[in-house]
Regions:
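Alpha-helical membrane segments of multi-pass proteins
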Residues: 1-346
Length: 346
């Protein structure tokens, strides 16, 4: 039984190993969350939605899977590709899930208690957040740092904590539980994620891909888990994971932000498809053919113009039809029986 996953010279075995520190950490996170949520609800301060609880539990499960046997043990001392998989899971899966599950009052109270409110205001600045994440990523994947930290349980624990902290900072401008820390512009959020996650990572991932020799002594000297898979091949696969592993989640987030932006700004209505319907004339006659056009009802069509049946109320200028009489003292126009000129139908 060990406290945390670390490099080992023992041959790899698929016999499960218990890492008590990992288990206690996950239990402590969940216990803290549910106790604080229960006390807040009992005191009437705020309630935690069921969806938020599910997100936190899912995030902790991903965190546990990335830290415990077998992935945690493989990443700590046997496979560079497993090490990189841990990094991706910490950065773009577990951490954002947990952040999305934290109620704003809970997170704000935690920062205030730890006296970190002012610090997080600075860390949430997009440029600062991007620098913190990318500097941490490059520093922890530098060969001397990786070999040093992975050699002991304490060092491996420190590396995992650094990844989680950097991931929290990365996501602050986009999904911070405290809304005042988020960026105000959806296009800004999309551009930030693209630049913060997709640019700097090219350098270390390219180094892993093009190197003809193993650059990590930890994984070069480790007993082979897959006998036909060399340390260089494992390292190259790690480079692929580092470059592309976060791409689906980051681009899915950008797409979600884009959809929300279009919905809230009205762009989806402006560029969306036109409503279709049948022309309804002032005399009540209905055209048999469906046509494309603006969604006007007979009660809302411009004076003397045909209307489209089945449209939404309020989409057009009010006319003075029998269904929408003129105000008192104003003469109501009679519907014209003359055919409409072509320019009035356009």
């Amino acid at each position: 039984m060990s406290w945390w996953c670390a490099a080992s010279t023992k041959p790899w075995t698929w016999a499960p190993t218990i890492y008590i520190g990992v288990w206690l950490t996950m239990v402590a996170i969940l216990a803290w969350y549910f106790v604080v949520a229960h006390r807040a609800a009992a005191a009437g301060r705020y309630t935690t939605a069921r969806r938020q609880k599910v997100l936190v539990v899912a995030g902790v499960l991903v965190l546990w899977a990335a830290s415990d046997w077998p992935l945690g043990a493989l990443g700590a001392g046997y496979l560079a590709s497993a090490h990189m998989t841990q990094f991706v899971l910490y950065s773009v899966v577990a951490t954002p899930l947990i952040m999305l599950g934290l109620p704003e009052p809970m997170f704000a109270a935690m920062l205030a208690k730890l006296r970190l409110t002012s610090v997080f205001r600075i860390l949430a600045l997009p440029l600062v957040a991007a620098l913190v994440f990318n500097i941490t990523m490059v520093a922890t994947h530098a060969p001397p740092t990786t070999d040093l930290l992975r050699s002991s349980q304490i060092g491996s624990f420190v590396m995992d904590i650094l990844w989680i902290v950097a991931a929290v900072v990365l996501w602050l401008p986009v999904i911070s539980p405290v809304r005042s820390l988020r960026m105000r512009s959806y296009p800004g959020m999309m551009g930030y994620l693209f630049l913060a996650v997709g640019i700097v990572v090219i350098v270390p991932s390219a180094a892993l891909l093009i190197s003809a020799e193993p650059i990590y002594r930890t994984y070069e000297l480790a007993p082979r888990v897959i006998t036909k898979w060399s340390a260089v091949e494992d390292q190259q696969f790690a480079g692929v994971i580092m470059k592309l592993g976060a791409t689906p989640i980051v681009w899915a987030t950008i797409l979600a932000l884009f959809i929300r932006w279009t919905n809230e700004s009205g762009l989806s209505n402006k560029f969306g498809p036109k409503y279709r319907g049948r022309l309804v004339h002032d005399d009540g006659s209905v055209e048999p053919e469906w046509v494309d056009g603006p969604s006007y009802t007979s009660a809302g069509a411009p004076l003397g113009e045909p209307a489209l049946s089945g449209a939404r109320p309020g989409d057009a200028r009010p006319d003075r039809s029998p269904l929408n009489p003129a105000p008192a003292g104003q003469q109501q126009s009679e519907p014209s029986s003359e055919p409409l000129p072509p320019e009035r139908l356009n």
